[in-house]
């Protein structure tokens, strides 16, 4: 599985067209994604969310607003439609074009929080809105959708002359801040949803299915009816695992849906997989280790610790070097050049059977240079404001052709080799120590194999020096492979990888 995160608002934006649209995902774009080796497209920012035109600026981050401050779970964001009255039809058409090309479609599901000014225009008439039937006079009730600070008004951390925002009583903020006075670093533009846990004492009230559970099941069923193939679940770990056990079971009775959890607590991995998630973010182990190796000169041998720490869950982890939350590889805040990320990307693509994700513009070395509104100059493509990606502009793509070809060759290689798609993994680092004719400081070697294919993969993380190494294949591996040479000489150029059939 190769996922392409496509942030619709930014993907089709240009210097003259401030906001991209669903219609920008045209036949030519779809063809390019297929040729790139993509299997799934994660359409980001499609659900209606806060923006400066429709919501109070005091509870809106940036001009375009955060795509994770949802104002209507049942609507498409009008910004990304060429004909706003036909926005759902435009979404359905985009999904149809992707499906016609054999691509699967993933969208965000944001279950932990919603925008302070949430009001559904498009929900089923029979269903009460979130908070509509709440008792706002109590801090917690399992029948409420929100948490409240009874008798206390909301005090926002920002102000603007002549602009006022009134909320009484104050609701808890999305990042579990149960206070009427969230800080500027809190998710003050959002409200925490109540799944039946009283955070004052941690008690769980699940004997009767909480109202929020039922509302969220209906939201998911609605988008399944629009033929989406999966959900990337925002901050899944902030919603109780008991809900996921219940809702995913209900969903999968009717749909073959893929569920991907954004999760950052390794001790919770297995319970969320047991609850029905198909894949989990591998930020804490994989991404953080590779970032540390690049920034601080850590040894490539540390990569072994990644899969060991997962205790057999390696193939369930979604690997990435970029997404909307992370600093761009090519940014001066990180690697400074997309090419410096090539060996790290090769590892992400080839190490396991699990899914791989790239972020729009990554395949052209997008740098995200300069300040962009709310998020400032942080090396990320802003999710809060109207920006465009220079590298993705047609007139500039030729300048980044070598980067694009690297990604295309890597992703198509991943998809076309059974040993990579579904084969087993054997780490060779234990058999190639420091004192041998090997360099575990900069070189990582492993085998991917299946019945009909055996591949030795050697990656050189040194960006300056050629590595001429002798890779020992231990007797144990030779037996697993059904016989092969006990040693291979491999020469790998700086920042590259080499695949040897053995």
Label the model's feature ranges.
Residues 432-474:
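Carbohydrate-binding surface patches
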Residues 148, 154, 218-317, 365-413, ...:
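Active-site-proximal helices and loops of the catalytic beta/alpha 8
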Residues 2-4, 41-43, 105-107, 231, ...:
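Hydrophobic faces of well-ordered beta-strands that scaffold small-molecule active sites
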Residues 7-23, 69-88, 189-212, 229-238, ...:
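The substrate-binding groove and active-site-proximal loops of carbohydrate-active enzymes
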Residues 22-37, 47, 56, 63, ...:
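Glycan-processing catalytic domains of CAZymes
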Residues 1-104, 112-114, 119-123, 127-135, ...:
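N-terminal structural segment of carbohydrate-active enzymes
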Residues 51-70, 111-185, 274-282, 371-383:
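Aromatic- and acidic-residue-enriched segments that line the glycan-binding/catalytic groove
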Residues 486-502:
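C-terminal beta-strand-rich structural cap/linker in extracellular carbohydrate-active enzymes
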């Amino acid at each position: 599985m190769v996922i392409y995160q496509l942030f619709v608002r930014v993907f089709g934006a240009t210097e003259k067209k401030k906001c991209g649209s669903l219609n920008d995902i045209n036949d030519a774009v779809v063809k390019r994604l297929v040729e790139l080796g993509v299997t799934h497209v994660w359409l980001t920012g499609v659900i209606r969310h806060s923006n400066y035109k429709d919501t109070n600026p005091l509870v809106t981050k940036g001009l375009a607003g955060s795509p994770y401050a949802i104002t209507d779970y049942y609507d498409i964001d009008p910004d990304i439609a060429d004909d706003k009255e036909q926005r759902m039809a435009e979404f359905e058409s985009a999904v149809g074009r992707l499906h016609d090309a054999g691509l699967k479609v993933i969208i965000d599901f944001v279950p932990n929080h919603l925008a302070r000014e949430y009001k559904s225009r498009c929900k089923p008439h029979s269903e009460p809105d979130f908070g509509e039937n709440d008792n706002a006079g109590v801090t917690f009730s399992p029948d409420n959708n929100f948490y409240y600070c009874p008798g206390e008004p909301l005090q926002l951390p920002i102000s603007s002359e002549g602009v006022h925002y009134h909320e009484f009583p104050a609701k808890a903020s999305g990042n579990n801040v149960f206070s009427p006075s969230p800080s500027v670093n809190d998710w003050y533009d959002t409200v925490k949803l109540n799944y039946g846990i009283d955070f004052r004492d941690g008690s769980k009230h699940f004997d009767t299915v909480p109202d929020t559970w039922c509302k969220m099941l209906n939201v998911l069923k609605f988008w399944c009816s629009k033929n989406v193939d999966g959900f990337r679940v925002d901050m899944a770990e902030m919603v109780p695992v008991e809900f996921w056990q219940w809702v995913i079971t209900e969903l999968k009775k009717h749909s073959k849906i893929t569920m991907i959890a954004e999760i950052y607590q390794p001790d919770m991995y297995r319970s969320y997989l047991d609850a029905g998630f198909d894949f989990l973010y591998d930020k804490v182990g994989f991404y953080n280790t590779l970032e540390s190796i690049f920034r601080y000169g850590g040894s490539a041998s540390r990569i072994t610790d990644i899969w060991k720490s997962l205790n057999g869950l390696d193939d369930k982890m979604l690997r990435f070097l970029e997404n909307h939350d992370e600093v761009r590889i090519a940014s001066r805040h990180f690697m400074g050049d997309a090419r410096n990320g090539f060996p790290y990307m090769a590892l992400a693509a080839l190490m396991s059977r699990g899914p791989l994700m790239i972020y729009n513009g990554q395949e052209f070395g997008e740098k995200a240079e300069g300040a962009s509104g709310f998020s400032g100059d942080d090396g990320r493509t802003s999710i809060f404001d109207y920006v465009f990606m220079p590298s993705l502009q047609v007139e500039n793509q030729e300048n980044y052709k070598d980067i694009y070809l690297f990604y295309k060759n890597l992703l198509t290689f991943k998809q076309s080799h059974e040993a990579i798609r579904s084969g087993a993994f054997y780490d060779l680092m234990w058999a190639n120590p420091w004192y041998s004719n090997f360099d575990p400081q900069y070189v990582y070697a492993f085998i991917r194999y299946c019945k009909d294919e055996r591949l030795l993969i050697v990656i050189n993380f040194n960006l300056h020096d050629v590595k001429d190494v002798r890779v020992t294949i231990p007797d144990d591996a030779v037996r697993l492979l059904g016989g092969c040479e006990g040693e291979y000489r491999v020469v790998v150029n700086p920042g590259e990888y080499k695949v040897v059939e053995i």
